[in-house]
From Swiss-Prot:
Binding site for Mg(2+): 18
Name of the protein described by the UniProt record: S-adenosylmethionine synthase
Name of the coding gene: metK
Source species of the chain: Pseudomonas putida (strain ATCC 47054 / DSM 6125 / CFBP 8728 / NCIMB 11950 / KT2440)
Function: Catalyzes the formation of S-adenosylmethionine (AdoMet) from methionine and ATP. The overall synthetic reaction is composed of two sequential steps, AdoMet formation and the subsequent tripolyphosphate hydrolysis which occurs prior to release of AdoMet from the enzyme.
Cofactor, how bound (note): Binds 2 divalent ions per subunit. Binds 1 potassium ion per subunit.
Record carries keyword Protease: no
GO molecular function: ATP binding; magnesium ion binding; methionine adenosyltransferase activity
Cofactor(s) needed: Mg(2+); K(+)
Organism taxonomic ancestry: Bacteria, Pseudomonadati, Pseudomonadota, Gammaproteobacteria, Pseudomonadales
Length: 396
């Protein structure tokens, strides 16, 4: 059962400054891993008026024109003119990337790949809930879909006066752990100065909000706040400085589950901040898909240079068909959560990451993708291919 009667989550669009930074960091990772799948990459990005700075540590045999790549990401998002305050073609790009510390490398690299140590200490959480078809909390799902629709309406020309920066927030009402209504919707979207607030609010309401949210959950008491401060002309990196890793709750479960604090974007799979969080989602989703619980949160933790997790914990919030201790036993039997095993299990050594950097890392649909000669599946941690084996092992 959910302990909440109301719960709120937020999301931001691909044009939000922090998300620009995330997408640049993951574009750098993808470009490198496409040439050198065993590269070590930790790329951080800062964007502000007229400048994009990339920094971090990379060890690789690949060569990438990083300045050109950064510009392309910014332009593709929609910042392609001084009229919108930021232009990828003319902004300054600074590259201060160095090499990975040999002290870290010696703790990760092993002669036997399966003995690869964790790239750092830390704790990671995974979560799943049966309240939506994608086994994610409803508030974050709806928030993502709103800003995703905003980008679609902007790029397609349906609402040509929209600009890239936007934020959404959705409050859901719960009864007995199930979503029964949406009590509040907030959507703030950057726009051209020519459009009136009346026209903007009417169009956003009809073509974004009502188009996206389930009609049966909207009711006469639902509050709508569309651009509640009025004009939102100045946005993106002009309005706010953007940094990689500043939207970790947007990236995960919207606050419904706990978070270990480590960001995802710009990190290769040897960094358990990312790969173990993906594995946690994979485990939790398969547990819920198997019918072992209606809700499941898993915590895993690691020590730097050590392969085996230092702990695995499970909480099913009283919804489990078997005990949490039994589920932990099943997880240990069915999933290998050593870093190298996670990379293999989820097939993570492919240029799949820029797509994760906007609209959530979880609750997405796996798709086949080809980059050069490399064909692979994205969002592999969303598969439920181990649900039946978990059911069988649990005797259900």
């Amino acid at each position: 059962m959910s302990e909440y009667s109301l719960f709120t989550s937020e999301s931001v669009s691909e044009g939000h400054p922090d998300k620009i930074a995330d997408q640049i960091s993951d574009a750098v990772l993808d470009a490198i891993i496409a040439q050198d799948k065993y590269a070590r990459v930790a790329c951080e990005t800062l964007v502000k008026t007229g400048v994009a700075i990339i920094a971090g540590e990379v060890t690789t045999s690949a060569w990438v024109d990083l300045e050109d790549l950064v510009r392309k990401v910014i332009i593709d998002i929609g910042y392609n003119s001084s009229d919108v305050g930021f232009d990828g073609a003319t902004c300054a790009v600074m590259n201060i990337i160095g090499k990975q510390s040999v002290d870290i490398a010696q703790g990760v690299d092993r002669s036997k790949p399966e003995d690869q140590g964790a790239g750092d200490q830390g704790l990671m959480f995974g979560y799943a809930s049966n309240e939506t078809e994608v086994l994610m909390p409803a508030p974050i799902c709806f928030s993502h879909r709103l800003v995703e629709r905003q980008a679609e309406a902007r790029k397609s020309g349906l609402l040509p006066w929209l600009r890239p920066d936007a934020k959404s927030q959705v409050t859901c009402r719960y009864e007995n752990g199930k979503v029964v209504g949406i009590d509040a919707v907030v959507l703030s979207t950057q726009h051209n100065p020519e459009v009136s607030q009346k026209d903007l609010q009417e169009a956003v309401m009809e073509l974004i909000v009502k188009h996206t949210l389930p009609a049966e959950l909207l009711h006469k008491g639902t509050q709508y706040h569309i651009n509640p401060t009025g004009n939102f002309i100045i946005g993106g990196p002009v309005g706010d400085c953007g940094l990689t890793g500043r939207k970790i709750i947007v990236d995960s479960y919207g606050g419904m589950a706990r978070h270990g604090g480590g960001a995802f974007s710009g990190k290769d799979p040897s960094k358990v901040d990312r790969s173990a969080a993906y594995a946690g989602r994979y485990v939790a989703k398969n547990i819920v898909a198997a019918g072992l619980a209606e809700r499941c949160e898993i915590q895993v933790s690691y020590a730097i240079g050590v392969a085996q997790p230092t702990s695995i914990s499970i909480n099913t919030f009283g919804t489990g068909k078997v005990s949490d201790d039994k589920i932990i036993q099943l997880v240990r039997e069915c999933f290998d959560l050593r870093p190298y095993a996670i990379t293999t299990m989820l097939d993570l050594l492919h240029p799949m990451y820029q797509e994760t950097a906007a609209y959530g890392h979880f609750g997405r649909t796996p798709q086949q993708k080809t980059v050069g000669d490399d064909t692979f599946t994205t969002f592999t941690w969303e598969r439920t291919d181990r649900a039946q084996s978990l059911r069988d092992a649990a005797g259900l």
